[in-house]
């Protein structure tokens, strides 16, 4: 298709003037004179056969036609600028946007990211965290890493690994725990899922509905583990996500009993294809997950 000549300088002059509602400020941004900007806008109006601005004593006001044109130009220039940025340093750079549960991001993904960057230096990874409730389409994500059973409407889900829950606490509290029954004398920290402690009690040989003295509910495992580290109570959390704290012994695992309530999954929209950057990340993540699964 042969495109008509596009008056790019005039379009840039209009877009800058419309954002600032001022020829003078647009001229400063574009490093040209105010007269040059005014001339370019006038030439665009003549080409289109419509007025794009109302010239007022104290500035400019967009006409209906100008208001229609502005968002299209802003989006187009932003997309061009974003594409040019991907060639920084003489190489095309792919952008990959991944959303992940905060606990997974901090406890498992970040310690391994250096390896991904070394293998794929021209992929710009953008990470966002969520609390497992995520809208992939609305948030513009390529992938979302979630915890659960793997069934999310409209998504393809690839299993990474299970992350069983176990008891974690500070060393001072661990010294007081000689049997699972001793937990009933402590504040129990948990997520919004009320069934986790009953499931663990049952696995440890206690009544599933053992009487609890005190409990605190957290919306993230990161906050819950920090509370446990500070001696606020005893947490039930995935040990795999807190390997560094266990290695440094700032957190202890007093009992071997663990209970599985789900797995981590790599999910994407079924309605969209996978880019080369997505395929690279998926392959790397599945490789790392396989190593994690073998190590359990």
Swiss-Prot record:
SUPFAM superfamilies: Periplasmic binding protein-like II, Winged helix' DNA-binding domain. CDD domains: PBP2_LTTR_beta_lactamase. One of its GO terms (cellular component) is cytoplasm. It comes from the Bacteria. Changing residue 43 to A: Does not affect the activation of ampC transcription. Able to bind the ampC promoter in the presence and absence of beta-lactams. Induction: Up-regulated by beta-lactams. Expression is negatively regulated by sigma factor RpoN, possibly through promoter blocking. Homodimer. This is HTH-type transcriptional activator AmpR. It comes from Pseudomonas aeruginosa (strain ATCC 15692 / DSM 22644 / CIP 104116 / JCM 14847 / LMG 12228 / 1C / PRS 101 / PAO1).
């Amino acid at each position: 298709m042969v495109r008509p000549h596009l008056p790019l300088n005039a379009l840039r002059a209009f877009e800058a003037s419309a954002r600032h509602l001022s020829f003078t400020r647009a001229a400063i941004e574009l490093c040209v004179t105010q007269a040059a900007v005014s001339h370019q806008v006038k030439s665009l109006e003549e080409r289109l056969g419509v007025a794009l601005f109302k010239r007022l004593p104290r500035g400019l006001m967009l006409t209906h036609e100008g208001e229609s044109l502005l968002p299209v130009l802003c989006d187009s220039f932003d997309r061009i600028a974003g594409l040019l940025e991907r060639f920084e340093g003489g190489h095309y750079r792919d952008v990959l946007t991944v959303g992940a549960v905060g606990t997974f991001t901090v406890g498992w993904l970040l310690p391994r990211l250096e390896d991904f960057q070394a293998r794929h230096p021209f992929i710009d990874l953008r990470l966002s965290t969520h609390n497992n409730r995520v809208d992939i389409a609305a948030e513009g994500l390529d992938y979302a890493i979630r915890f659960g059973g793997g069934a999310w409407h409209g998504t393809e889900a690839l299993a990474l690994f299970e992350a069983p829950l176990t008891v974690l606490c500070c060393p001072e509290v661990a010294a007081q725990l000689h049997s699972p029954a001793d937990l009933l004398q402590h504040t129990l920290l948990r997520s919004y899922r009320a069934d986790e402690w009953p499931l663990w009690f049952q696995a440890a040989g206690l009544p599933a509905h053992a009487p609890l003295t005190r409990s605190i509910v957290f919306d993230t495992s990161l906050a819950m583990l920090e509370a446990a580290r500070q001696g606020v109570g005893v947490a039930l959390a995935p040990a795999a996500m807190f390997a560094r704290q266990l290695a440094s012994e700032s957190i202890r695992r007093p009992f071997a009993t663990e209970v599985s309530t789900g797995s981590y999954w790599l999910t994407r929209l079924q309605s969209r294809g996978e880019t080369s950057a997505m395929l690279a990340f998926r392959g790397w993540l599945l490789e790392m997950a396989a190593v994690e699964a073998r190590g359990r």
